[in-house]
Amino acid sequence: MTTPRAQEATAASAYPRRFRRAEERGRRIGRILRRVAGVRHVDEELLDRIGRRMYARDEPGAALVRAMRRDGRPGAERVTMAQFERALREGVQAVPDAPPELVRFFSLVDAVPAWVDFDLVERGAGVIRRLGRTASDVLLQLSLIGGYRFGGPAELLVATGGLSGATAMRRLGETETWSNAVARPGGLRRDGEGFRLTVHVRVMHALVNDRFEHNGRWDVHEWGLPVNQSDLAGTLGLFNSTLLLGARALGWWVSAADARAVMHLWKYVGLLLGVDEDWLFDTEREQNVFNYHVLLAQDGQTPAGADLTEAILKGQRRLSEARSNRLRAAYARARLLGMLRCFLGRQSLEELRIPVTLPWAVPPVLVRNLAASLLLGRTEHGRQLLERAGERFRDRRGALLFAGARPRVGPLPL
């Protein structure tokens, strides 16, 4: 079902105005990615699909949300939050007289495709757990802040109230809580926290999309749908192949078999999130080719991205100063700014209003990661040590991001 505003926008143009508006900038940012992925020619058909799917949503999620809205729907058809939460915890069969849309939605997310190999999922989860702080570094600096370089998703984050330092850090904590749950042993089994939080995030996306499609605060002609298939698939790419690319850039050795396992884990997560199945990839190369074309499809830098970056950096500084002496806090900031310089480059830092510094704190990180992955990572005992170290780091980080409260993902904004 397409809303009148989305129909009107699609009738006016096959693509929103932001599509390919800063293509040369995308080429510059994606130079290394293009070489890594072996892209020789731009796939115009793929770019066309990316542009068109800026007007496409997660339809099963949207149908569930329509049934959750208080719009005079008969009681037997309307889905309550209590019914959704019980179905998520216990299965839809545990909901008495479950409404049809609730049954349809959970029949999709509960169905495990034949291609899902849970042994491979568990191997991928172990790789992510061993990455520990390196995974957090990459997801914050390359995936999150790197994603603020483009208009569209950044505007939605600002519109939903992400500009205060406290809110920015809470959202970062919620994202890390979810990604950590996905990587726990058994996390993506039906009774795992990673499964439950992923489905929760999917419905949260659908609720936000529904709200901003209808409240008159979102320019569909400019940006496409608030939460659309192209942005969803692009975001998924920040958690799989971008994580691997960034970890290697920081000195972490990842074998081809381990990389395939990480890709497989996130392929299943993408399915649960409602990403179109033809954009769920098995290999790094396929994902990197897609990611490169996503870069070409993007808009340029907008004020929203720089404002979000400022909020994150202020929040990170407050965390460092609260838990460390002045010298350690200064090192933490130098480490963060140095990695951002390496990942994003001077020009992107200037566009995001990030101080440009010499990355002197990065070489020790490279040495440490090389030693950890090449020495400890080669034995079972060493891998167990890395997993435990990663778990301790995640516990400390969660306590900081949530100021001592229990880490969690935000409630559904019904």
Which stretches of residues belong to each language-model region?
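Mature, function-bearing regions of proteins
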Residues: 1-236, 240-414
